[in-house]
Amino acid sequence: MAETYDLAVKEPELATAKSPYTGESINRFLHIAENKEDLFLQNKMQRKLGQLTGTCFQRCVGMDAFNALHSVTFEIDEKYKTNYHDNFIKFLTEMHKYNLVIGGAMTDVKGDRSKLPHEQEDEDLYLRIVDRNEKGVYVKGAKAHQTGCINSHWMVVMPTLRLSENDKDYAIVGAIPVDAEGITYIYGRQSCDTRSM
């Protein structure tokens, strides 16, 4: 994770971009790709970080989620006259201002894989909405393999599979501070913890 910040200082032409929202230089992991050159530089940066660290640097899922959400929220707003895109841009701008790390929480624990989320015996095997009010939505459930979230400032939660109409409470994408009340992390030893470098 630290190397993603260091590379932005050592090689700004590779690991930074200009924010269209703040006008300032930002970490490329927070940048929304605007053209094929941006995509090329994202890939080149990831390759460089892989060479420098020899491991996961824990920011790719968050970057990919932001790029997807930029398009999807716009398309949803166009179709349904909602304001998800404006809300997303406000959040993205805050992330740009403070150079924060976004983790992506996509993988659900799934339970019985032959069943959709609403068909599971245990409702908490997938993340779902349990309450809504003027402040937002409240979620409950589980995600798996979220090592990067432990080292992030925020996590973007999203479904991992196609959902049916009966799964609408599970159709949630949102950002949660990683230290929010009620979140429990279970972290185990990794298979490569003792490997020689």
Question: What do the PLM-derived regions correspond to, one by one?
Answer:
Residues 99-112:
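A short, Trp-centered hydrophobic/proline-enriched beta-strand micro-motif
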Residues 109-197:
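FAD-binding core of flavoproteins
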Residues 2-102, 148, 154:
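Internal helix-loop-helix
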